[in-house]
A protein has these predicted regions:
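Bacterial Sec-dependent N-terminal signal peptides
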Residues: 1-30
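Feature recognizes metal-dependent phosphohydrolase scaffolds
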Residues: 26-248
Length: 249
């Protein structure tokens, strides 16, 4: 009787383990399928703008509106007071950007009264805006309000989020605004900048791959040396001094 009971117990245990194992396998497969389905369903959202300088001297400006429509315009010459209009991927946080000469920043700056250091925005414009406004670095119109102080961003704007070029444009704009008041904005390269520019897109949102596919180009081409953001990025430092402090990613 005891051996029969033991046999039944072993049988039930084996059956239960097999059932749990099959459930876990099915759950794993189901999770992978859902992830693939999510990637397939991801669509274009508000993005850009991307400014590309053509070999014939024309300027191509690419935007995506919040409905996912690609607006691709080529100019023989840019209109006077040409302005880029930027929003996040949902059409929020609107600000304008005017192109300005790109200069390589210095690597050694004097100590400012205040230095605000941030890192790894990873495509989250909403978080960047909240952080900068909460610390009185920008005002309600997203303009520089940090006076003669120094904003330091230690890399990694690319990947994970859906507002990558928008964050680049914000710092591009603030850099010029800060300089006019005696302040400084320093954006340094992290590890994700060279990764993406080398076409390593492991952590890049699917929407960017979809955009590149629709434009019939590789994604890094939108930040190449013949683009405005690409020219700005290629001048960024990988390490920098402020006073006696060394900053690296």
């Amino acid at each position: 009787m005891t051996s029969k009971t033991n046999f039944i117990n072993y049988f039930l245990l084996a059956f239960t383990l097999a059932f749990i194992s099959s459930g876990l396998s099915a759950g794993t497969l189901d999770f992978k399928d859902k992830k693939k389905d999510k990637e397939k369903k991801e669509e274009l959202t508000a993005d850009g703008p991307y400014v590309l300088y053509q070999p014939d001297g024309q300027i191509r400006v690419i935007n995506v509106d919040k409905k996912g429509n690609i607006i691709d315009t080529t100019y023989t010459t840019l209109p006077q007071n040409f302005t880029l209009h930027v929003t996040d991927h949902k059409g929020r946080f609107p600000f304008d950007v005017k192109l300005h000469p790109v200069k390589r920043p210095g690597w050694n700056y004097p100590q400012a009264d205040k230095v605000f250091v941030m890192s790894d925005p990873h495509g989250r414009l909403d978080c960047v805006i909240s952080l900068l406004q909460g610390n009185h670095i920008i005002d309600k119109d997203y303009k520089w309000s940090f006076g003669k102080n120094h904003l330091m961003i230690i890399g990694d704007i690319f990947d994970r989020g859906k507002d990558v070029p928008q964050i680049f444009w914000l710092f591009y704009k603030l850099e010029e605004e800060a300089a006019k008041t005696g302040g400084h904005v320093s954006f340094m390269l992290g590890n994700h900048e060279p990764m993406v520019l080398a076409n390593d897109l492991r952590y890049t949102k699917e929407k960017y791959k979809i955009l590149a596919e629709k434009l019939k180009m590789e994604y890094p081409r939108l930040f190449g040396p013949d683009t405005e953001l690409g020219r700005w990025l290629e001048t960024r430092n990988t390490m920098q001094m402020i006073g006696n402090d060394l900053y690296v990613h």
